[in-house]
């Protein structure tokens, strides 16, 4: 099938966010073209595909911060999946095609062309996107015009970085990650009700944390996420020289996980990435929606990336469908999407900041109170954000969401004595700067926070065949 010259909606990027957007809009009978640069090995009815594929179910998560059950209301559907990311992306990409989108992999968008907007437009953007140039891995080139554009291009974020120039970084969450796949690891919680579940553990020196996630193919993903500056300091003082050796040395700093890996062997080479947290001043402009990592990224903690990608993908689809159907003007539709992404990002950022502060504080109380051994009370409050139910209509009340935001805001604000962050002796000079940055972020988010995804009296209408926006209080 040849890449067409015209589409109603062009989606750049076939990851979770882009594939979700494409699936949701294609099911509405809207003409969708989905372009993905790489070649791949509930609303869009993907659940059954994941269930039948054999991914390991993630019923709960446990960690050294607390042996805490993240299930909100136990039941048949209160689980997620531990997935091989490439296989997960492939399933979602194919689902978009099966839903009616014209999907092409191995095709990279190299440039976006814009037309000037009306003089009445006051937003700071290059204009209305009207076409895109592409290049395929086999050497073919071409262009495609469209009415609407969705940028789900991942961290490259072509719209934010190249045209809108709206990306900013959060220096407190400048992390580096390294991970590998192990065979023969002892499952976590053998002989208990949580046997085989993922486990997350803070490093003993407070420099980061380690994940331990069993996969359906018999391997276990083990990754180390570490503050970049602290990682640099540790490498300088370490006796090892290779990245692989430093990864293995770092894993030893997680006592429980290192024990689980005693009988295991590292399968293949380790992988590395810079996990720098960033966000944007807006997540779109007229006829443009920005989704997932293309607009914002926080941290692997609590799997925030996938949730923000999928919820943002649905938000983009809802707002585009609303614009096409005339539910509201386009300037209202794109701003509804942008505000919703900002709200969800803000909620998750506060929770991740609180967890990160607790990791670095080690034994000092951040998410708990003096004398409290665990963090069950804290997670009972922030659970709606971690699970994403804060973004699902009718699942939790606005009061519960607001409580989670308030709790997280208070947790990451600087304490009066400035003693909540405990770092290695070599990095104690970072304390005052870290405290101030976290306080500034918390204050800004708390000030800007809105407890529901309602903009100018509009909320999502999640009905197949009439996807779009409706006035708050209107049935159907």
From Swiss-Prot:
It is an enzyme of class 1 (oxidoreductase). One of its GO terms (biological process) is ochratoxin A biosynthetic process. Pathway: Mycotoxin biosynthesis. Pfam families: FAD_binding_3, Trp_halogenase. SUPFAM superfamilies: FAD/NAD(P)-binding domain. Induction: Expression is positively regulated by the ochratoxin cluster transcription factor otaR1, probably via its binding to the conserved 5'-ACGT-3' bZIP binding motifs found in multiple copies (3 to 4) in the promoters of the OTA biosynthetic genes. Expression is induced by sucrose, glucose and arabinose which repress the gal4 transcription factor, a negative regulator of the ochratoxin gene cluster. Its EC number is 1.14.19.-. It catalyses: ochratoxin B + FADH2 + chloride + O2 = ochratoxin A + FAD + 2 H2O. FAD binds at residues 14, 17, 306. Chloride binds at residues 304-305. InterPro entries: FAD-bd, FAD/NAD-bd_sf, Flavin-dep_Halogenase_NPB, Flavin_halogenase. It comes from the Eukaryota. GO terms for molecular function: catalytic activity; FAD binding; flavin-dependent halogenase activity; monooxygenase activity. Keywords: FAD, Flavoprotein, Monooxygenase, Oxidoreductase. Belongs to the flavin-dependent halogenase family. Flavin-dependent halogenase; part of the gene cluster that mediates the biosynthesis of ochratoxin A (OTA), a mycotoxin composed of a chlorinated type I polyketide dihydroisocoumarin moiety linked to L-phenylalanine, and demonstrated to have nephrotoxic, immunotoxic, genotoxic, neurotoxic, and teratogenic properties. This is Flavin-dependent halogenase otaD. It comes from Aspergillus niger (strain ATCC MYA-4892 / CBS 513.88 / FGSC A1513). The gene is otaD.
């Amino acid at each position: 099938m040849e890449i067409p010259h015209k589409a109603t909606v062009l989606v750049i990027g076939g990851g979770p966010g882009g594939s979700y957007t494409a699936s949701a809009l294609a099911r509405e009978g809207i003409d969708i073209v989905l372009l993905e640069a790489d070649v791949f090995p509930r609303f869009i009815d993907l659940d059954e595909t994941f269930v039948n594929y054999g991914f390991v179910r993630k019923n709960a998560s446990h960690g050294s911060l607390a042996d805490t059950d993240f299930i909100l209301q136990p039941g048949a559907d209160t689980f997620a999946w531990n997935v091989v990311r490439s296989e997960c992306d492939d399933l979602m990409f194919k689902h978009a095609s099966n839903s009616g989108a014209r999907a092409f992999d191995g095709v990279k968008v190299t440039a976006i062309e814009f037309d000037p907007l009306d003089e009445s437009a006051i937003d700071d953007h290059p204009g209305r996107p009207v076409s895109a140039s592409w290049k395929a891995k086999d050497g073919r080139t071409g262009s495609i015009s469209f009415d609407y554009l969705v940028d789900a291009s991942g961290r490259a974020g072509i719209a934010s970085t190249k045209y809108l120039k709206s990306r900013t970084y959060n220096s407190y969450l400048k992390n580096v990650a390294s991970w590998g796949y192990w065979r023969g690891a002892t499952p976590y919680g053998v002989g208990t009700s949580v046997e085989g579940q993922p486990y997350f553990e803070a490093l003993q020196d407070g420099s980061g944390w380690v994940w331990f996630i069993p996969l359906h193919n018999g391997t276990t993903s083990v990754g180390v996420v570490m503050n970049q500056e602290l990682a640099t300091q540790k490498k300088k003082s370490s006796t090892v020289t290779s990245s692989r050796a430093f990864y293995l040395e770092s894993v030893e700093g997680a006592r429980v996980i290192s024990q689980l890996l005693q009988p295991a062997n590292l399968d293949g080479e380790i992988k590395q990435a810079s996990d720098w947290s960033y966000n944007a001043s807006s997540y779109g402009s007229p006829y443009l929606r920005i989704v997932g990592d293309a607009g914002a990224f926080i941290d692997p903690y609590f799997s925030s990336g996938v949730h923000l990608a999928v919820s943002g993908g649905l938000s983009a689809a809802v707002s585009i469908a609303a614009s096409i159907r005339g539910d509201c003007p386009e300037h209202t539709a794109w701003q509804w999407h942008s505000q919703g992404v900002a709200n969800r990002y803000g909620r998750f950022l506060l929770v991740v900041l609180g967890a990160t502060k607790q990791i670095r504080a080690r034994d000092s109380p951040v998410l708990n109170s003096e004398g409290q051994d665990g963090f069950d009370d804290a997670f009972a409050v922030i659970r709606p954000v971690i699970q994403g139910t804060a973004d699902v209509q009718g699942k939790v009340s606005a009061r519960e969401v607001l409580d989670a935001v308030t709790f997280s805001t208070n947790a990451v604000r600087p304490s009066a004595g400035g003693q909540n962050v405990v770092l290695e002796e070599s990095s104690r000079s970072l304390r005052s700067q870290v405290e101030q940055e976290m306080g500034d972020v918390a204050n800004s988010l708390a000030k800007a926070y809105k407890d529901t995804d309602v903009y100018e009296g509009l909320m999502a209408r999640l009905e197949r065949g009439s996807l779009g926006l409706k006035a708050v209080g209107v049935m159907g």
